From Swiss-Prot:
Leader sequence residues: none
Segments of skewed composition (Basic and acidic residues): 178-192, 215-227
Gene: SAC3B
Pfam families referenced in this protein's UniProt entry, alphabetically: MCM3AP_GANP, SAC3_GANP
Protein's name in the database: SAC3 family protein B
PCI domain: residues covered: 625-813
PANTHER family according to UniProt: 80 KDA MCM3-ASSOCIATED PROTEIN, SAC3 FAMILY PROTEIN B
GO cellular component: nuclear periphery
Length: 1697
């Protein structure tokens, strides 16, 4: 295929030199070219048939960095265009340059610098076979002349260059004779299989003319060519260096990053520009290493860069150079898109600042080693770079104006679009290596597939026609955008939203909806992606934005979380959009996405009770929340997969894989899941991820959920973390419904289960389970405990109970929201396909240990050797600046020592200079070594001492390292030449050498073997024959120099090891001497012989011999006393009896907190002491039942965490004893804190100096929260450490526990006691002081609240006690003064007094005395009988019981009598008026009884009113003319009161407990009042006859005598009325007869007097009137019958009095 440079066709494999002339070259340049030509002839440089060949080692001369054309002529400052590097014209091919079949080589990116073949050792030619191991070594130049094989190297068209020092194992029959596959064939295969795109850094110049610095972009597919020699000698092309001082092996002096370059002087003086010199370390390094050599072409580079800067700003003013922005210097911040830029897009002048180099690549201060770097990856699509034209064009025919070039570009685009119309379909974005994302490039290219390979060769000629844009420019894929927005919200958006008032509450300044600030406004999500860089935030700003958003979550969970979530969700969505637009897929992006997912997970639970908002109301859309979490998870998992393909394992991947698996358990509200989704997701996971604990947990949950095993499901929910529980919470309702349905089907009607067991099974211990049970048709019945009972059908089987937040989940959440959302602190590691051996790191300088801070790792399956490293997050490393060192500095570094294996030494290379050692296509470039002792007459040969690792023939050395024997089994990693010249001062101590792990490349090499086509294979075979004629002599000569260098390096390394060892041994020797001196001083301080004692000491010394038995006996007794059980009642009984003398049974309870669960097993000595103290305290106070002796009657009950002790105390006599019960309860043994502290009289807290005081304070506050207000309990703080003889409160403990800040209504006083023995201070504590613990209990008993002195009464007795005194007072008052309301008021007051007595007694018991543990006693014990007799019920003071009694008394109150009775004061002149008044009064009483008080019905009220008026109404004659009806209201209402208090006989509320003091006080006050007022009132008048009798007798003269028959009828009616009344009374009172038998009769003297007076007055009236004898006899009989009826009624109604 013809090759057309500048429109001239050349045949394939043409050896004709390119017509390349240095247009516009200066005289200096021409002189240099002439000198170079002569110099080349003198050194015997063997040229091909081309006219001029460049010298092979000029990189080491003073003219290093000059550019040469393919013909060998030096390019001047006005280079028009570099011809292509074909197989015959350009004698050298760049490392990794893809071979173009037919002799067509893609245009190298032109940097005004020659290709790497122009200097130092040329890169392997296209036909060079792959060398799997070893390294290329070339002698160091001497006086600017290179020595080595380059001096006599022929063109690769004649004989391909054999890369020296490489061992070639036999990997496949199709490889060469030495085991390595031919490069041409591999390249052909790869170019058809996967040709990754080549992204370019393009520096705009003259419109469309540009200098393009090629970067290789990785494709998703891994090809075999990644491990071949044309691809950076076995290194992956995925790890490529950014734009630096070397590109394509050439010194790009002028192409320093814009952020570090400021042109302050004119181009003519560029060579003396200090700013430029300071910003280009590579130039300084080169100057240092070449003596006084200078750069004669420096002004040319300056001219080019100055023109580039002016032209780029003039042509594309909108394309602002982004490199000047420091925020663009990101590490791992960009990922290249596989889509090309849009049409018409100009090349950004993008560059990287010097501090944004790859930190993970080795750097060097020697610029020569970078001559091997190439800019285009092997087997990539061609990178067509336009020629560089100077501003001053000399020859018009080679001058291309901007307009013409633009037209040419449009024509070329149209041609390419027509030619590749069917092949330019958009392809999906593929994961791109993180290494490639380092460079902020705005242009991308798509990889070529097999169909595009041939056309790509055809289109290579377009590169010679001035078209520098990629082939796929007209594709529809969006271009890569680099954000430059400096704020969290773009200024334009911020202003627009201020005008519209579209500001969230969190963005407003002082609540103003039209005002915000830079620190508050956050970019809002829009569906239309921004295409302007100023509207997109770069990675640092995105991180700051996320930090700001998370700062809003630094608060506890509350109801404001809904509004905050709606704000954060939208803003985080905008962050995801900016990440996608910039193709940022690095570790920092992973962290951001993980935080977003955590927020969505938390919202699933915390906002589950909210519904979707309508209108302007806020709401929570569960479906939308899960949808966004799903999308975020998909992006996150793609990043995980990309990192895994590069050998990087993200520690949090397993966590989020587990979350995603929990999300796919089953369908739930807001999300539908197919049954096979979880299985597919698990199948797509790697085996390692599938076996992690998080994923296994999710699989167990899924198994329990899908099988309906609700017990296992909620057991796992208790073990889950907070986020896992939030995901599981979505299935709580469903599992609970299934659980209740299954239990319902297994129960029969009226069968049930304990509610407590059910709540434990379904995780609702502290929730409203009753509502759930009733929702599904169960009923709650209380037996010994509440039971859920099956009544009928199971309800709502198809509809779950409404979802609510679960307390089971709430128990797991952190204090603030941000703690749950933020990523946990993890140490990032790098996984390898094989396990890493254990490394023992010795820091030889400063005794520091550290890990290599590589930012990028080598991808797996890319090379035979893989170097892995540990990452440390240190963002400041990339910004650090280190000074360049002099070349005479000696190397210094840390090393790794592995005793059983080889000893490895790696160089310490500063992070900013690692790119100088790295080629554009690999993580570690093939580094050349230059020996100062090298000879020019010995070419390089292969290394003869490279050996395979034992037991693994796949393991070989990577080209970047050499292993050689030093002493025994000591090996060292290769130290690059520049690294040997660094100073120890510049070497960071946090760098550790990495370990090389071999990989099997078989799968990689054979991956695309079936994708080759027949024509391409034939072409490769043709080219392979031409390049396989290799001279074996070069290999032999290479081995000689390599062996010499090995020996020199081995000596240097051995000296380094010896020097380091000497330093370490000197320090050890110094330490040993110090120890010896200290030991000698201690020995000299000892006394010699018997100590001198004074007479005073001898006199005070006790006589007698030391008795070891006696000492051991005392120790044994002390130990027995310390560990003996402590009967609390025995210690405090006397004190409690003295404080409660009237109590027959005393109950006292102490609550213990030993903090046993807070002490870890592997703790400090102080924590071990605390653990021993907690065990000692528990064994003394709460011994196990099996450990207690059988004859110990004082221990009534013992169980884990609780014990009941007893002691009988004589109370003044041998017969009267008081039972003293004491209870010890441990709060950590039970989960219900309120039940544990119920009835507590004191609190004992075991503190420790070893545990954090803040944690102990939280534990103490947790206990005190369950203590009711007003308890005023004493607190005893027991510490296990000794604080001296005086037990003064320790200031640290008091302040640490916050004892002074405790609520005084709960804790009235506190005391601190140390239980450690005084002699044990500073020593190990073996046993503790028993006496101090006893003293502490005595203090607690003395300060505990008194036991209430209660009196058990019945409600009727309590009421009558208060009402009887008021009733006596009312009876002493005249009838005219006592009205109905006065009687009602006295009745209601007595009821209210009774209610107050009951309430005051309950309020006097805030602690819930007596403690419920007293019910644990056996029924047959005497103590149990005392408890039941003298102690009240457990719920006597409960709010429910008090409320019940109060409501009963309140319902007994009577309403006021509102009728006006003034008409009673008007007298009656006739009997008719008397009858009318009587009937009117009767009507008032009937209305009161039936309507106002609702006491009885109308019929009963009518009869009862007649009886009341007959007994308690009299007729008085005033002024001898008018009669007045005077009712006795106290008698009337006494009968009404009796009816009212019948409600107090209810059995459930018939008794109550009151304080004896209140009852005695009420009795005494009423007695005093009665005695004081008794004399002022007259005695009660005798009882009068019935009302109708008085009316008949008194008014008989005024009436006509009734006929006999009428009287008889009246008598009969009266008898019938009495009989009917008797029947009514008997039937009504029959119910209460049994209840009234035990009540004393309360018949007053008035009733007895009334009976006697009634008989006498009847007889007197009969005698006075002298009625006929028969009538008087009948009247007497009638009176007798009435008296009998009245007596029987009085006997029946005696219960009311």
């Amino acid at each position: 295929m013809a090759f057309r440079p500048f429109g001239k066709d050349l045949g394939p494999m043409s050896s004709k030199p390119a017509p390349f002339t240095p247009f516009g070259a200066s005289s200096t340049t021409r002189l240099y070219l002439s000198f170079l030509f002569l110099h080349t002839a003198n050194v015997g440089f063997a040229c091909s048939d081309s006219s001029i060949q460049p010298p092979a080692s000029q990189n080491h001369s003073a003219f290093a960095g000059q550019s040469f054309g393919p013909g060998g002529i030096r390019s001047g400052p006005s280079i028009q265009r570099a011809p292509p590097l074909s197989a015959s014209q350009n004698p050298q091919l760049s490392i990794g340059k893809p071979y173009r079949p037919g002799g067509v080589q893609s245009v190298p990116p032109i940097n005004r610098i020659p290709s790497p073949s122009a200097f130092q050792n040329p890169s392997p030619s296209s036909g060079q076979p792959y060398q799997p191991g070893g390294i290329q070594r070339i002698p160091e130049p001497f006086n600017g002349i290179a020595w080595g094989p380059e001096a006599s190297r022929t063109s690769p068209s004649v004989r391909p260059y054999q890369f020296p020092g490489v061992q070639r194992p036999n990997l496949n029959p199709q490889y060469g004779h030495d085991g390595s596959r031919n490069f041409l064939k591999d390249h052909g295969e790869h170019s058809r299989a996967t040709s990754p795109p080549a992204t370019s850094h393009i520096l705009s110049r003259m419109g469309t003319d540009a200098v393009e610095i090629g970067r290789s972009q990785d494709s998703k597919r891994k090809s075999r060519s990644d491990i071949l020699p044309d691809q950076n000698m076995g290194f992956s092309r995925r790890n490529q260096s950014p734009v630096s001082g070397f590109e394509n092996g050439n010194l790009v002096d002028g192409f320093q990053p814009l952020s570090s370059r400021t042109w302050m002087r004119s181009p003519s003086s560029a060579e003396n520009n200090p700013v430029r010199s300071r910003s280009n370390p590579n130039q300084l390094i080169h100057q240092e290493q070449t003596g006084n050599s200078s750069f004669p072409y420096a002004h040319e580079v300056a001219e080019i860069q100055e023109a580039t800067r002016r032209k780029s700003s003039a042509v594309a003013p909108s394309d602002k150079p982004l490199g000047d922005d420091p925020i663009l210097s990101q590490h791992d911040s960009q990922r290249f898109s596989t889509s090309p830029p849009t049409s018409g897009t100009k090349s950004y002048t993008l560059s990287r600042s010097s501090d944004s180099q790859f930190p993970g690549q080795p750097s060097s201060v020697n610029s020569f080693n970078n001559a091997r770097k190439t800019n285009s990856s092997p087997a990539t699509k061609r990178t067509r770079s336009p020629p560089v034209y100077p501003i001053e064009e000399d020859i018009p025919r080679n001058s291309f104006p901007s307009q013409d070039c633009t037209e040419g570009e449009e024509q070329a685009r149209a041609k390419r679009l027509a030619r590749f119309k069917g092949e330019l379909e958009p392809i999906a974005d593929r994961p791109v290596d993180i290494q490639l994302t380092k460079s902020p490039v705005n242009k991308t290219m798509k990889p070529l597939d097999n169909k595009q390979t041939f056309n790509s060769l055809e289109s290579s000629r377009d590169a010679l026609k001035g078209d520098a844009l990629p082939d796929y420019e007209n594709s529809e894929q969006p271009s890569l955008i680099i954000g430059v927005c400096p704020d969290m919200c773009p200024e334009s958006e911020r202003g627009e939203r201020e005008r519209k008032g579209d500001l969230d509450h969190y963005e407003r300044v002082d609540g103003d909806r039209n005002q915000t600030s830079k620190s508050l406004a956050v970019k809002k999500y829009t569906r239309t992606a921004e295409r302007e860089a100023i509207l997109i935030r770069p990675m640092p700003i995105l991180q700051n934005t996320m930090e700001y958003l998370l700062s809003l979550l630094d608060r506890p969970y509350n109801e404001n979380f809904l509004g905050m979530y709606n704000f954060l969700w939208d803003r985080m969505r905008a962050i995801r959009m900016d990440l996608r637009m910039q193709h940022i897929f690095n570790q920092e992006a992973i962290t951001l996405l993980e935080q977003m997912i955590r927020l969505h997970i938390i919202a699933m639970h915390e906002l589950c009770e909210y519904t979707k908002g309508e209108g302007f109301s806020e709401g929570f859309d569960a479906h939308l929340n899960i949808e966004q979490m799903n999308k975020t998870s998909v992006e996150l998992f793609q990043m995980y997969d990309d990192h895994r393909k590069k050998g990087i394992t993200v520690p949090t991947e397993k966590e989020f894989r587990g979350y995603y698996a929990l999300l796919k358990l089953d369908k739930h509200p807001g999300y539908k899941v197919e049954p096979s989704e979880l299985s597919l997701d698990l199948a797509n996971m790697t085996p390692e991820i599938r076996q992690t604990s998080e994923v296994l947990f999710a699989r167990n949950v899924a198994r329990a959920c899908r099988t309906g095993n609700f017990i296992a499901f909620f057991r796992l929910a208790r073990k889950a973390s907070y986020l896992q529980a939030c995901l599981m919470h979505a299935h709580f309702s469903k599992l609970r419904t299934q659980a209740l349905a299954s239990l319902h089907s297994g129960l029969q009607i009226n069968q049930g289960l304990p509610v407590s067991d059910m709540s434990n099974w379904i995780g609702m211990e502290e929730e409203d389970i009753e509502a759930l049970l009733e929702y599904h048709g169960f009923s709650i019945k209380v037996f010994e405990e509440p039971y859920m009972v099956k009544n009928d059908l199971f309800l709502h089987a198809d509809k779950d109970y409404k979802t609510k937040c679960s307390k089971l989940v709430h128990m797991k959440k952190s204090r603030t929201i941000v703690e749950d959302v933020s990523a946990p602190t993890v140490v990032e590691d790098v996984s390898t396909p094989f396990p890493l051996p254990s490394l023992i790191t010795e820091a030889t300088i400063g005794n520091q240990q550290c890990i290599t801070a590589h930012k990028h790792e080598m991808p797996p399956a890319r090379s035979l050797k893989k170097q892995t490293s540990m990452r440390l997050f240190d963002k400041e490393v990339a910004d650090s600046k280190t000074s360049l060192l002099a070349e005479e500095d000696k190397p210094m570094g840390t090393f790794v020592m592995n005793p059983p294996g080889p000893f490895v030494i790696n160089p310490v290379v500063h992070q900013e200079k690692q790119n100088d050692l790295t080629s554009a296509g690999g993580f570690h470039s093939p580094v050349k070594l230059y020996s100062p002792f090298g000879s020019p007459k010995f070419p390089q040969t292969k290394s003869s001492n490279l050996e395979k690792q034992p037991n693994d023939d796949r393991i070989g050395m990577s080209p970047g390292e050499i292993k050689f024997s030093i002493i025994g089994d000591v090996y060292t990693n290769h130290v690059p030449g520049p690294a040997l010249q660094q100073s120890p001062k510049s070497m960071p101590m946090e760098i550790m050498p990495v370990t090389t792990i071999a990989e099997c490349p078989t799968s990689v090499e054979n991956k695309y073997a079936l994708e080759e086509s027949v024509p391409e294979a034939a072409m490769i075979c043709t080219l392979e024959k031409e390049f396989n004629d290799i001279d074996e002599e070069d290999e032999d000569e290479d081995g000689v120099i390599l062996n010499q260098y090995d020996e020199e390096v081995a000596k240097a390394k051995l000296k380094l090891i010896i020097r380091l060892w000497k330093r370490w041994s000197s320090r050890q020797s110094e330490l040993r001497e110090r120890r010896q001196l200290a030991a000698a001083a201690a020995l000299n301080s000892l006394s010699l012989g018997t100590p001198i004692r004074f007479s005073k000491t001898d006199q005070s010394r006790a006589c007698g011999e030391f008795n070891i038995d006696q000492a051991m006996r005392r120790r044994f007794e002390e130990r027995e006393k310390s560990w003996s059980r402590l009967n609390i009642s025995d210690v405090i009984a006397d004190i409690l009896v003295g404080r409660n003398p009237e109590s027959k049974c005393i109950s006292w309870k102490v609550v213990l907190c030993t903090q046993t669960k807070s002490v870890n097993s592997s703790s400090s000595a102080s924590q071990v002491t605390h653990s021993a103290a907690s065990r000692w305290l528990s064994s003394k106070l709460m011994p196990h039942a099996e450990h207690s002796s059988l004859n110990d009657d004082n221990l009534l009950f013992s169980a884990p965490g609780v014990s009941v002790w007893n002691k009988w105390v004589a109370n003044g006599s041998d017969i009267d004893f008081t039972c003293c019960l004491s209870v010890a309860r441990d709060v950590e043994a039970e989960n219900d804190m309120c039940e544990t502290t119920c009835g507590a009289s004191a609190v004992l807290f075991l503190a420790s100096g070893g545990l954090p005081l803040n944690l102990q304070r939280e534990q103490l506050n947790l206990i005190l929260e369950s203590v009711p207000n007003g308890s005023v309990l004493p607190l005893l703080v027991v510490i296990s450490s000794c604080n001296g003889e005086h037990m003064e409160p320790d200031t640290d403990i008091v302040s640490g526990l916050g004892l002074h800040d405790i609520d005084k209504s709960k804790i009235a006083s506190f005391s601190i006691v140390s239980i450690a023995n005084k002699s044990q201070k500073g020593q190990e504590v073996h046993f503790f002081n028993d006496s101090r613990l006893r003293d502490g209990f005595k203090w607690l008993a003395s300060n505990s609240p008194l036991q209430p002195n209660l009196h058990h009464v019945k409600l009727r007795e309590l009421f009558l006690t208060h009402f009887s005194f008021s009733l006596e007072l009312l009876k002493q008052m005249p009838d005219q003064e006592v009205g109905p309301n006065i009687c009602i008021s006295a009745f209601n007051d007595a009821l209210e007094t009774s209610r107050r007595n009951i309430t005051s007694a309950a309020e006097a018991n805030p602690i819930g005395w007596p403690c419920p543990e007293t019910m644990l006693l056996e029924d047959n014990r005497k103590e149990c009988l005392m408890v039941k007799r003298y102690l009240p019920n457990l719920d006597w003071s409960s709010a429910e019981n008090v409320e019940l009694l109060s409501s009963v008394l309140e319902n007994c109150k009577l309403p006021d009598f509102e009728d006006d009775l003034t008409w009673l004061t008007v007298g009656c002149a006739s009997g008719a008026e008397i009858e009318n008044h009587t009937q009117r009064l009767e009507g008032c009483l009937i209305e009161y009884l039936t309507q106002r008080s609702n006491l009885m019905g109308v019929s009963l009220a009518t009869k009862e009113t007649g009886v009341m008026l007959e007994r308690n109404t009299r007729l008085e004659l005033h002024n001898s003319s008018r009669y007045h009806i005077t009712p006795r209201w106290i008698g009337i209402f006494q009968r009404i009161f009796n009816w009212r208090i019948m409600g107090l006989f209810d059995a459930s509320s018939s008794s109550a407990y009151v304080l004896k003091s209140d009852l005695n006080m009420s009795t005494s006050s009423y007695a005093d009042k009665f005695l004081a007022e008794d004399a002022s009132y007259p005695s009660c008048p005798p009882n009068l006859p019935l009302l109708h009798e008085m009316i008949e007798i008194s008014c008989s003269p005024l009436k006509s005598p009734p006929p006999y028959d009428d009287k008889a009828q009246r008598v009969v009616e009266t008898g019938m009325l009495i009989d009917d009344h008797r029947d009514i009374e008997e039937s009504m009172l029959e119910k209460n007869r049994e209840a009234c038998r035990g009540i004393d009769l309360m018949i007053t003297e008035d009733d007895e007097l009334g009976e006697r007076s009634w008989r006498s007055k009847g007889r007197e009236a009969a005698e006075k009137k002298t009625i006929e004898k028969r009538e008087s006899e009948r009247l007497d009989e009638l009176l007798e019958k009435c008296n009998m009826v009245q007596n029987s009624i009085a006997e029946k109604l005696c219960i009311y009095f």
